[in-house]
Regions:
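Short beta-strand His + acidic residue motifs that chelate non-heme Fe in jelly-roll/DSBH
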Residues: 61, 79, 107-108, 119, ...
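Soluble periplasmic/extracytoplasmic beta-strand elements of cell-envelope proteins
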Residues: 71, 78, 118, 138-141
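Short acidic-glycine-tyrosine-enriched beta hairpin
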Residues: 51-55, 83-123
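Bacterial N-terminal signal peptides
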Residues: 2-13
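Double-stranded beta-helix
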Residues: 21-39, 44-45, 124-156
Length: 156
């Protein structure tokens, strides 16, 4: 069974719970599959993950220590590039992928279901779910073996 871990939380908005207390909305990453020492990429691990971002959750500024492809399955993710750029695509990835745009440093863009981002290790970014329904993201990441799925970055 894949372990689910909390990967980010909001520092601001709080949601009421059934017990009268409040909790910060979260994003939960579940590793679905993994392969170490991928052919042609020794010392790397390929990871397939699912992330569910609750309404109001903010993903802190971070980067990945390898190339990552993120496809939005449900909800709308608000994505902000802080360093480098992400490449946004849409459509059928195998038959008819369409380039949508680059999201350059300092730009924010909504990412909708059926769209996907390609991020490189040099790209720092943050994201949020500003909607009322969960955002579901499927990720394929080629990381250095032993590297965390995301590495926090200090804001300037």
């Amino acid at each position: 069974m894949a372990a689910a871990i909390v990967v980010a939380f909001s520092l601001g908005a709080l949601l009421p719970t059934a017990f009268g207390r409040s909790k910060a909305p979260t994003a939960v990453r579940t590793a679905l599959a993994r392969s170490q020492n991928v052919q042609g990429a020794p010392g790397r691990t390929m990871v397939l993950s699912k992330v569910v971002v609750e309404p109001g959750a903010q993903l802190a500024l971070h980067h990945h220590l390898g190339t990552q492809i993120s496809r939005i399955a449900a909800g709308t993710l608000t994505y902000t590039a802080r360093k480098g750029f992400a490449v946004l695509h849409s459509g059928d990835a195998e038959k008819d992928p369409k380039f949508v745009r680059h999201i350059e440093a300092g730009q924010t863009a909504p990412i909708h279901p059926g769209q996907w981002l390609v991020e490189q290790p040099s790209d720092n970014h943050e994201a949020a779910n500003r909607g009322s329904k969960p955002v579901v993201i499927y990720l394929a990441t080629l990381l250095k073996t032993g590297a965390p799925p995301a590495t926090p970055v200090s804001k300037p």
